Amino acid sequence: LEKLLRTQFPDLNSKYVRQFALLFLDLQKKCDSAEISTKALDLRGMLDALRLMRRGVAAGAALDMGITNKAFDSYEQGLIRDAIAARIPAQLTAAKLFD
């Protein structure tokens, strides 16, 4: 996953390459334990969120659009937001995210 992120986003800060990979694994664990539905485990949504961040959208809003909003249940969305907040600051900007 880290290799894919580096290929798609060569200018992504290496610290955040690792954090996004770990975020995906965290969501995968939540899916495996049936805490959240598999709809939230969407690699394409994460890549799209990174593209939005590159264009200037704050990380929290971009990840909401790309991942969190795929879940319809508000409790499930809360679990997803908590997993995201543990890895990625909501106000993270493109200037800090990309080199």
Q: What residue ranges belong to the model's regions?
A:
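C-terminal regulatory/interaction module of P-loop NTP-utilizing enzymes
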Residues: 1-99
